[in-house]
Structures are given as structure tokens and as C-alpha cells.
């Protein structure tokens, strides 16, 4: 620092001018060439996949990362700054441009055009050594709309993907980590028929099993029909009988006997 103050008198500048010169030099070291925006601070951290023993570490549409614990303790980063996870195709990392405003943040719906999007919004309080987050599962939200900024939508294909963390505030990017290595998701494999002709023994076994299955189905059908037939015959269709006795009457015909001596 003392050498910087000696630079002013050496080139004929006063103490105030020397201080201004040093401030300008420090500012220029943080400004990207061709822009008026300060370059984000580089954090020497590489995102890593979670432990191999974790179930679901890699699926058809998700992968799980370790927490970046204690990686955002720089004095340039505030607790109010937003920490995004940038998800990109491996061949799109070179063309990635950090958004300057929240309106420029790409959503998962823009992934097919840009090759990257931002998700898993957080802050450094959640990434302390004893943070609240345990794992970061990328692509785990099946209910959010892909047009929504920050949506953790399932990944559309096997990849390969690369990720990094990006810190932003209202003025633009503040800091960023390094890109991760390539991550490839699992792929669904179609069922394949057994190659080569089947042996005669296999054909005989398949035929016997088919015959036994047909016989079993026939027996079951016959038992079902017999049971249903007997059940229908034994079912009474009359109503409940009334209790009581019925007296039987015999009908007699009354004949009048002619009176004796009648003429």
C-alpha cells in the first residue's frame, strides 16, 4: 500500500490526486471490459453431487447437490442478496451471461432457447455451516409452472448438465462460483427380447404351462356357473308365510226329503 502512495509524487501528482488514482485503479480491476458494470467476485467453489449413498441422487429428471456451506461469507455479499443456482447444458456454459435485473432472469420455459435457467432461490443465511437446507434437489418440483422465474421444474433430458451458484442484488451480479463438472441423468432403457432361438425344452415348458392355465380357467368357469345355478334354484320367490292354522270345511249339499203322504 505504501508503494501506491509513492506512485503519485513520482509522476508529479499531489496526495489527493494519488488517492483518487488508486481508487480508480481499484474500480477498473472490477469492471468488465466493454461494460460499465463491476465484474462479480469469483468464489473458488465447485458444486458437487451429493453422497453416493443418498437414494435418488440421480434420476430420470433430477439430481441432488451438496449444500455450499459457508461459501458466501465475503464482505461483498449481504444477507439480503439472492443466491441462485444456474442450471445449464454443458455446451451452453460459454454463452452464459449473468442477468443484470430480475426481469432478465430466464425461467425453465426459456431453457430450450438459451440453454440455461436460474432456480432454487436462497440467501446466504440458509447456507451457513448449520443451515436449514440439507440437500439441493434440482428438478424436484412437478407442480410449478415452467414460465415462473425460479421454478424448479423437472429437467427435460439426460443432459449433460453443469451448474454454478450466482449471487445477485438489485444492481446486478455480486459473486459467482465455478462451474461444476458434467452431470448425466439416468436414462430409461427399453425391454429387449432374449437373443437367439429358444431351446426345445423351453418351448415344451411354455406349451405345458399354457395348457394348464387354460384347464384351470375352464374349471373355474364351470364352478362359477354351477354355483350360480344352484343359488338361483334354491332362492324362494314367494313372500313370507303368515303364521296360523287353516280350518278345513267340507261342503254338504242339503236335500229336502219329500213329506210322507204327499200327493
Swiss-Prot record:
It comes from the Eukaryota. It is found in: Membrane. The keyword Transmembrane applies. Its main location: membrane. Residues 34-204 are extracellular. Keywords: Glycoprotein, Membrane, Signal, Transmembrane, Transmembrane helix. The chain crosses the membrane at residues 205-225. One of its GO terms (cellular component) is membrane. Coiled coil: none annotated. Glycans are attached at residues 51, 76, 91, 110, 140. It is a single-pass type I membrane protein. Residues 226-263 are cytoplasmic. Residues 1-33 form the signal peptide. InterPro entries: Uroplakin-3. Disulfide bonds: none annotated. Belongs to the uroplakin-3 family. This is Uroplakin-3b-like protein 2. It comes from Homo sapiens.
Amino acid at each position: 500500500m505504501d508503494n501506491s502512495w509513492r506512485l503519485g509524487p513520482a509522476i508529479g501528482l499531489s496526495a489527493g490526486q494519488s488517492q483518487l488514482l488508486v481508487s480508480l485503479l481499484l474500480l477498473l480491476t472490477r469492471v468488465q471490459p466493454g461494460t460499465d458494470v463491476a465484474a462479480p467476485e469469483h468464489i473458488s467453489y465447485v458444486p458437487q453431487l451429493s453422497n453416493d449413498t443418498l437414494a435418488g441422487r440421480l434420476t430420470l429428471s433430477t439430481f441432488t447437490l451438496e449444500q455450499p456451506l459457508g461459501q458466501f461469507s465475503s464482505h461483498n455479499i449481504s444477507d439480503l442478496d439472492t443466491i441462485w443456482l444456474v442450471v445449464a447444458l454443458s455446451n451452453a456454459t460459454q454463452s452464459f451471461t449473468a442477468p443484470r435485473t430480475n426481469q432478465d432472469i430466464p425461467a425453465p420455459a426459456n431453457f430450450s432457447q438459451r440453454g440455461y435457467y436460474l432456480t432454487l432461490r436462497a440467501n446466504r443465511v440458509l447456507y451457513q455451516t448449520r443451515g436449514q437446507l440439507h440437500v439441493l434437489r434440482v428438478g424436484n418440483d412437478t407442480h410449478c409452472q415452467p414460465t415462473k422465474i425460479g421454478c424448479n421444474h423437472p429437467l427435460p433430458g439426460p443432459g449433460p448438465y453443469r451448474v454454478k451458484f450466482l449471487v445477485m442484488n438489485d444492481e446486478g451480479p455480486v459473486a459467482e462460483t465455478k462451474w461444476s463438472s458434467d452431470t448425466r441423468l439416468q436414462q430409461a432403457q427399453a425391454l429387449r427380447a432374449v437373443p437367439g432361438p429358444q431351446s426345445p425344452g423351453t418351448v415344451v415348458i411354455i406349451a405345458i404351462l399354457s395348457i394348464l392355465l387354460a384347464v384351470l380357467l375352464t374349471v373355474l368357469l364351470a364352478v362359477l356357473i354351477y354355483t350360480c345355478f344352484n343359488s338361483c334354484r334354491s332362492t324362494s320367490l314367494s313372500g313370507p308365510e303368515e303364521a296360523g292354522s287353516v280350518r278345513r270345511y267340507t261342503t254338504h249339499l242339503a236335500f229336502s226329503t219329500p213329506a210322507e203322504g204327499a200327493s
